[in-house]
A protein has these predicted regions:
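Mg2+/Mn2+-dependent nuclease catalytic core
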Residues: 174-180, 478-495
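Catalytic cores of nuclease domains that cleave nucleic-acid phosphodiester backbones
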Residues: 415-451, 455
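Structural motif
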Residues: 154, 470-474, 506
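Metal-dependent nuclease catalytic cores in nucleic-acid-processing enzymes
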Residues: 183-191, 341-349, 431-436, 488-508
Length: 529
């Protein structure tokens, strides 16, 4: 076995040996299906700690002819699939970890030459009669082997994008690397010697102008995951099973780590879920993953609407974006949407394909973004926070007149940034108004299923604050009075579902008169009859 060619199954065995392993081998049924077809070129991008390397190790263990993996996979999902052994350990597998190669190569400028030299050296051990010393190109070496023997290769590149991210301003390094990838995978000759190509990293494939640099690859991303959706992170069903096994509070786990919406799946951060199961501590595990420093300069770029969008999402709103203009690198940002799309790929935002909108997915990310914003002391954020604290205090004091005046003030000051021209707009203003709840409350739940309908907003206090802070059930009315909102809360029994969390509940009815441009408020304390 070599380091890059037929490296065996020991790396994947480490994952299987771990206390928690969630079976994602069902993905192999898809890669088996597309083997040696036009769909055999795959790029799957996902955030750090979302299982990129484990997936790459799994593919290597399954396809690599340098080991025997039948026993390893037979009890897993793929072991029950038809044709399980057809492709098992049948191919020469080249597995490259670009991040690892950076250090022995001596820096990003040497990575391509290092990979080429070391991989060809290992290939000569397998095919000494076919590869003369004169061959110094890896694509040419693979082509020569294929021509002489008919042998095709599975090529797996982990952290494919590290040179795009870490050498983002070195255009010479990037051009050399992109040309290397094109030589490996584009054109008629690679079609002959590639059985399967699998690239994985944080960013999708870099665009040259508006086209992917490797436009023969099918891309599965955090904005369009398709068949990969249940193999990126942990699904809700998988997390529920782990919570049952480890006796963890599922609803609290959902508040903290859920929120990535991929197709029909609610997807959780696997790193955080595993840490929670083992240590039973609800906290952010995100800052240890290395991207925190990257987002501070991103969110402070001077693009119209960027800071307002961040504040809106921190307060619980979603923001419509166009993810198609992002060039899939860390340099060529042209607008707010490019920054937000980048944050989606980094895992700091979720994305809803149906509404084309970005949002803060969970409490863990909400805390990290809030820290990043506070670190730069945004004037916009500090102003919002001060006015929001006054609004929250007035709500908790049941001072309805002050609540109405505070919301009206926020409306008047920020209506230019947040359009206040339709029935959904008061919801956005209300969310921003209660921005300061992020310290004491979980992310507000919109359209909370309760009683005989859906409450507009429900704010549930975090467990450590639940003795001092009531849950808030908030109903909005457009061109109706606030008392009507309170009656709806009571008649449709919205508080009953909230009593599963706490009996300390405030009912807040807020109305907006479009003609008069005024707000009214009624607040009552909930009491079971």
């Amino acid at each position: 076995m070599g380091r890059f060619v037929n490296s065996g199954n020991s790396a994947f065995q480490v994952a299987l040996n771990s206390e928690i392993y969630v079976d994602k081998t069902g993905l192999l049924a898809y890669t088996n299906k597309v083997m040696d077809t036009t769909a055999k070129f795959i790029c799957n991008s996902r955030p750090r700690r979302f299982g990129k390397s484990i997936t790459a190790d799994m593919l290597t263990a399954y396809y690599c002819k340098g080991c025997s993996s039948e026993e390893m996979f037979s009890s897993l999902e793929i072991g029950q699939a038809p044709g399980f052994t057809k492709y098992l350990n049948q191919y020469d597998v080249i597995h490259l970890d670009i991040q690892w190669c950076m250090e022995p190569a001596g820096g990003p400028e040497n990575v391509v030459s290092y990979i080429t030299e070391k991989t060809i050296l290992e290939l000569r051990n397998y095919y000494p009669e076919i590869l003369p010393d004169s061959i110094s190109s890896l694509p040419e070496a693979l082509s020569c082997i294929n021509t002489a023997t008919g042998q095709k290769f599975v090529v797996i590149i982990d952290e494919w994008d590290v040179l795009i991210r870490d050498a983002s301003t070195d255009l010479v390094v990037q051009e050399e690397y992109i040309n290397f990838l094109r030589g490996m995978f584009k054109g008629s000759e690679p079609t002959k010697y590639i059985q399967l190509a699998y690239l994985t990293g944080i960013l999708p494939i870099k665009k040259i102008k508006t086209q992917s640099a490797l436009n023969n690859f099918a891309e599965f991303t955090m904005t369009d995951a398709r068949i990969f959706s249940r193999y990126i992170g942990f699904t809700e069903e998988e997390v529920r099973m782990l919570c049952e096994k480890y006796h963890r509070d599922f609803s609290k786990t959902k508040h903290w780590y859920d929120g990535y919406l991929l197709e029909q799946y609610q997807v959780y951060n696997p790193k955080a879920v595993v840490e929670l199961m083992i240590w039973n501590k609800f906290q952010s595990y995100w800052s240890d993953t290395g991207t925190y420093e990257a987002i501070v300069p991103l969110i402070n770029m001077d693009f119209d609407g960027l800071k307002t969008a961040i504040i809106e999402m921190l307060s619980g709103n979603s923001v419509e974006i166009d993810p198609t203009t992002f060039q899939n690198d860390m340099v060529n940002f042209t607008c707010r949407d490019d920054i937000l799309t980048c944050l989606i790929h980094l895992g700091y935002l979720g994305y809803d394909q149906d509404t084309h909108s970005a949002f803060v997915p969970n409490e863990e990310i909400r805390q990290e973004l809030a820290k990043a914003v506070k670190r730069k002391k945004w004037n916009e954020f500090l102003t919002f926070q001060q006015e929001s604290s006054e609004l929250l205090d007035a709500t908790l004091d049941m001072d309805a007149d002050t609540v109405a005046r505070s919301i009206e003030k926020i409306h008047n000051e920020y209506a230019s940034a947040i359009q206040y021209n339709n029935e959904n707009s008061p919801s956005s203003i209300l969310s921003i108004g209660y921005l300061s709840t992020m310290r004491y409350y979980f992310k507000p739940i919109r359209e909370f299923p309760a009683g005989r309908g859906f409450a507009d907003f429900v704010y549930l206090p975090k467990p450590e604050y639940s003795r001092d802070y009531p849950a808030l059930v908030v109903e909005l009315k457009w061109n109706q009075n606030a008392q009507t909102a309170i009656r709806q809360i009571k008649n449709r029994q919205y508080p009953e579902a909230v009593t599963n969390y706490t009996d300390n509940i405030l009912l807040v009815g807020i109305s907006y008169d479009k003609k008069q441009k005024t707000h009214n408020c009624v607040i009552e304390k909930y009491s079971e009859k």
